[in-house]
């Protein structure tokens, strides 16, 4: 007879491309970042709201199901009632649904912030993930571009609160209406050209990544990347490509001259001229508030999402870091936003003015590490005090030590593995513990009453490199390990912790 039983295949312990794990240090640093961003947003009068990870696909708006599944860009699946559901690809579209659903109950303007993970079903690459964290703030119900100017000011203040020095960043502002005026001038006006307009805008959005030559290919026939993948272009004629690139590269000495350059580029387009007028108003508000050195008009800013309808802005870090090829490169964008007056209106049949700003938390974490911000470079908190288990028949007694420490607001854990004393001490050291609590039969049966041994793990490590002077060595050893009465456990642990505070 033969045994038909087969060993099941072992599961592969690896992540899908574009996803990553985070350890305690990164989580702690991220929490500090979120706290700083939250404090800045709240200083400007925004309040928290939270929406779920999953929405109806049609509520997200931009991506709709085709015959088999929703278009690329989102992770989607069918519910048991045949409805398409999707993981959110940003935090703005879910906010629009929330505002529309609760419109009559919310104050207007409605000022809110929210943080969380978003998901993109896109090709991953270096620094490009399928799951990443954003932190948004939005004002809904404010038609004035003063709300857009405020977003830019808040973005600047938030970066400085996070430890980015003035001069190491710039908030760049443009207006989709100006871009629309340029596109009208090259024959891409009207609803029939909406798709090509978005292709052009997304091509311009890649200027920092691909440079003018790469953008020219995306505006024209298309571009093939290093892997051989081909991205279809907008199919513009050469003269139209040159006109778009000339607009994007437009420069001016100061705001007034830049506005003049933009007016000339949209001459004859009512929508384009309206956009330039809005930029002029934003510039005046920024100057009056004292932010003109930190915020500037830049025609290369487009933002890649379709729902923007007016001013758009981008937070860019201007310092250089080492690129993948070892050469210095500008760090680039870590957030952005803009006006989206039609997004809430999709649910209400009328436009509702809205504007917002989003920080890419995951990308910003890398940036703050690069500039040595104390928010992410500060040492992580020590591990818990570890109570060793030397005699399992006294487990309840050891648990009592842990409870006493926790009752005193001291992080503590009972060792729950099956190893001996030396391995337990190594475990405590790996956990980053400041000290370990030890009680064997010698301490428990002490003539003067039950005692515990406190081992200062950091001082213990220093003993190896201690002075050869015997008196100094003995003094250090006495501090590194000492015994106290059981009832003095908490005070003794606090003494050790105070040495490292």
From Swiss-Prot:
GO terms for cellular component: cytoplasm. Gene3D superfamilies: Anticodon-binding domain (3.40.50.800), Bira Bifunctional Protein, Domain 2 (3.30.930.10). Pfam families: HGTP_anticodon, tRNA-synt_His. Its main location: cytoplasm. InterPro entries: aa-tRNA-synth_II (IPR006195), aa-tRNA-synth_II/BPL/LPL (IPR045864), Anticodon-bd (IPR004154), Anticodon-bd_dom_sf (IPR036621), His-tRNA-ligase (IPR015807), HisRS-like_core (IPR041715), HisRS/HisZ (IPR004516). GO terms for biological process: histidyl-tRNA aminoacylation. It catalyses: tRNA(His) + L-histidine + ATP = L-histidyl-tRNA(His) + AMP + diphosphate + H(+). It is found in: Cytoplasm. It comes from the Bacteria. It is an enzyme of class 6 (ligase). Its EC number is 6.1.1.21. Keywords: Aminoacyl-tRNA synthetase, ATP-binding, Cytoplasm, Ligase, Nucleotide-binding, Protein biosynthesis. GO terms for molecular function: ATP binding; histidine-tRNA ligase activity. NCBIfam families: hisS. HAMAP family: His_tRNA_synth. Belongs to the class-II aminoacyl-tRNA synthetase family. Homodimer. This is Histidine--tRNA ligase. It comes from Methylocella silvestris (strain DSM 15510 / CIP 108128 / LMG 27833 / NCIMB 13906 / BL2).
């Amino acid at each position: 007879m033969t045994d038909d039983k087969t060993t099941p295949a072992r599961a592969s312990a690896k992540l899908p491309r574009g996803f990553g794990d985070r350890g305690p240090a990164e989580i702690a640093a991220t929490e500090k970042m979120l706290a700083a961003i939250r404090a800045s947003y709240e200083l400007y009068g925004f309040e928290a709201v939270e929406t779920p990870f999953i929405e109806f696909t049609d509520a997200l708006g931009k991506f709709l199901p085709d015959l088999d599944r929703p278009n690329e860009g989102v992770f989607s699946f069918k519910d048991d009632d045949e409805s398409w559901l999707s993981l959110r690809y940003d935090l703005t579209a879910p906010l629009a649904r929330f505002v529309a659903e609760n419109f009559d109950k919310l104050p207007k303007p409605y000022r809110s912030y929210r943080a969380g993970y978003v998901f993109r079903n896109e090709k991953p690459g270096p620094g490009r993930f399928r799951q990443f964290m954003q932190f948004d703030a939005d004002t809904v119900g404010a038609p004035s571009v003063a709300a857009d100017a405020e977003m830019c000011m808040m973005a600047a203040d938030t970066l400085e609160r996070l430890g980015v020095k003035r001069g190491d960043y710039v908030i760049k502002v443009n207006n989709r209406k100006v871009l629309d005026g340029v596109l009208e001038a090259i024959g891409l006006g009207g609803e029939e050209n909406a798709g090509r307009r978005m292709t052009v805008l997304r091509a311009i959005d890649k200027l920092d990544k691909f440079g003018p030559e790469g953008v020219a290919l995306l505006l024209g026939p298309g571009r093939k990347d290093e892997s051989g993948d081909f991205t279809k272009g907008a199919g513009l004629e050469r003269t139209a490509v040159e006109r778009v690139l000339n607009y994007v590269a437009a420069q001016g000495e100061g705001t007034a001259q830049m506005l003049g350059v933009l007016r000339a580029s949209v001459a004859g387009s009512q929508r384009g001229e309206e956009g330039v007028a809005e930029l002029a108003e934003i510039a005046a508000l920024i100057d009056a508030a004292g932010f003109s050195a930190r915020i500037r008009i830049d025609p290369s800013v487009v933002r890649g999402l379709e729902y923007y309808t007016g001013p758009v802005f981008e937070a860019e870090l201007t310092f250089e870091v080492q690129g993948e090829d070892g050469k210095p490169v500008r760090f680039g964008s870590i957030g952005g936003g803009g006006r989206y007056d039609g997004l809430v209106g999709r649910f209400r049949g009328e436009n509702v003015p809205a504007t917002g700003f989003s920080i890419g938390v995951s990308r910003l974490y890398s940036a703050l590490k690069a500039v040595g911000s104390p928010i992410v470079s500060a040492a992580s908190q020590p591990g818990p005090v570890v109570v060793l288990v030397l005699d399992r028949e006294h487990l309840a007694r050891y648990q009592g030590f842990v409870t006493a420490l926790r009752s005193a607001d001291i992080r503590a854990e009972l060792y729950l593995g099956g190893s001996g004393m030396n391995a337990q001490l190594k475990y405590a050291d790996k956990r980053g513990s400041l000290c370990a609590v030890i009680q064997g039969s010698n301490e428990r049966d002490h003539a003067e009453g039950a005692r515990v041994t406190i081992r200062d793990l950091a001082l213990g490590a220093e003993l190896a490199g201690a002075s050869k002077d015997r008196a100094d060595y003995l003094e250090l050893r006495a501090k590194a390990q000492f015994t106290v009465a059981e009832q003095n456990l908490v005070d003794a642990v606090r003494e050790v912790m105070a040495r490292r505070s």
